[in-house]
Amino acid sequence: MCTKRQYGLLESIRSPRDLDSFTPHQLDELECQVRDFLIQSVAKTGGHLGSNLGVVELSIALHRSFRSPEDCIIFDVGHQCYVHKLITGRHDFKALRCKNGLSGYPSRHESNHDIVENSHASAALSWADGVSRARTLLGNDNYVIAVVGDGSLTGGMCWEALNNISDDNNRRLVIVVNDNGRSYARTIGGIARFLNAVRASKSYLWLRESSEAVFSHMGSPGRRLYQGIRGAIHGFLSRFSSSNKLFSNLDIRYLGPINGHNRKALEKAFKQAKQYARPIIVHVITEKGHGYPPALEDALDCLHTVGVIDPSTGKSASVQGQVRQDTWTGVFGEELLRLAESNTNIVAVTAAMLHPTGLSMFAEKFPHRVFDVGIAEQHAVASAAGLAYEGLHPVVAIYSTFMNRAFDQVMMDVALHGAPVTFVLDRAGITGPDGASHHGIWDLSLLRIVPGIKLYAPRDASTLRNTLALVCSEDCPTAIRFPRGSVCDDLPALRSLDDGIDVLYGSCDREDIVIVAIGVMAHACVRAAQLLAESGIESTVINPVCFWPLHRQVLARVSKAKLVVLAEEGAKSPGLGDYIAGRRLLEFVIPGDFQPQGSRDELLDAIGLNGEHIARKIKARFNQIINCV
């Protein structure tokens, strides 16, 4: 890591072509500057650190070997793109992942060097297949490069794409497997074992590089001799590599493994790949967090994603006097573990996100009752249906945005068979800095049309614990959704009605205005009701923790009201709004288009999902209704 905060070489780069004039010494210094810049910048804003530290040399070699944007580079997963952004002239990392700042993923809005905002894993090879096919048809002979890493090869889409790529090899497609042995944490499964066999064989890389060095010391004759026999050397050494067999059976040429932190070796490999001019796999071995000791010492995930940290230690930068708050994810993980201790039928399923979804403690206590299936959401859900068939109660812990990928399996494998599978949808609603692709706003629209499913949205830690205990005893499909971040303060009910409907504010005798608050929106709605009361307008706030299907008590309450207000943190979808027509309904939901990045509070305020905005809108609409009577 550089000791001086001087980035002269980095700051001189405005396009990838600027790299062409750099000397080897300057390139070495540039790698140092880039790595230090990433550490210092991401420490201030948070972001994907470990992954990007591992692709510094790879990104520079790619841009020196190919001609972006004419040769298009597609990253999978897209969070590996920070160095790519720097090389393509985007140096303003002060507002990385903040409102109006640089995206943490590739973005066409930022640069024509970015092809796809691919923050959902395993899609790049399908994109590369389509782009390369189109270029062949259109007579465009530029290269398409797919950089596939951070566990993306555990996703089925990659293999579907490889199946099609191998069937049509008349195109210039380079597939770079960035093999760091991890997704968030260590990559699991059979594919990972194939790749790990190569990574574990350090003698393989050493023999390849040593043989080249020996011949190079013989001068020009030695280098010519090596060029002539390197194929035989590679073939001999590849006999020790199971990875070569894995890819060669797909009838796609394989080159590697290559030391991903040796720029010279990378550029040589890419030169060979270009000469082949057909689909080829370049297997690159990298180290997540390379060059930054705190990342390498982080056994959990090599500082995959960080918040604001102290760059000298990699530790979270705590604010003086700040009290640590429980998170929704943490409360879920603790409660599931507690329930599993007494209910041996509870098992957990996750798609390469054991720690981010709160299952680490569960895995430590019950390693044989948790199943990490890799980045394979469709498989996770269908496998859970099989677990349920044998009498277990699987809890599928998944981010709301990734649930979209498995909708068919929810419908056809779980719901069609009435399987008692519980989906725990973390990061539901507005998530914040990861932007449009990570907001969990579509789950309500999708799941409300699934026959037989029950949907729950706890408002605080207590209702989350109670709800989790309830759904783990249900004999039907269920789903619980909660947002990202610190859990809300407990909001006790004033009174509980039948079917689990809680009254949070107001008198049940006054039904001029009934506010139906779903999940965490209960807090904003109670605040709105308090503000309305200050203006002499009385209202009742009810909170159905199980909000779908619609309860008769909810329908009975709203049928008598002069104004019905619905507040939920999701895109507008079928529900109460279909039951209440016309002026009597006022909805507070998330607009149905893609939402930008920014802090959760910033975005909720901009949308109008806060107590003050809700109160103003209710007051204006209620006055209209009164004046029209």
Curated annotation (Swiss-Prot):
Query: Binding residues for Mg(2+), per the UniProt record?
Result: 150, 180
Cofactor binding description: Binds 1 Mg(2+) ion per subunit. Binds 1 thiamine pyrophosphate per subunit.
UniProt KW keywords: Isoprene biosynthesis, Magnesium, Metal-binding, Thiamine biosynthesis, Thiamine pyrophosphate, Transferase
Its pathway is: Metabolic intermediate biosynthesis; 1-deoxy-D-xylulose 5-phosphate biosynthesis; 1-deoxy-D-xylulose 5-phosphate from D-glyceraldehyde 3-phosphate and pyruvate: step 1/1
Report the GO molecular function annotations. 1-deoxy-D-xylulose-5-phosphate synthase activity; magnesium ion binding; thiamine pyrophosphate binding
Tell me, in a sentence or two, what this protein's role is. Catalyzes the acyloin condensation reaction between C atoms 2 and 3 of pyruvate and glyceraldehyde 3-phosphate to yield 1-deoxy-D-xylulose-5-phosphate (DXP).
Q: What name appears for this protein in its UniProt entry?
A: 1-deoxy-D-xylulose-5-phosphate synthase
Q: Which organism is it from?
A: Tropheryma whipplei (strain Twist)
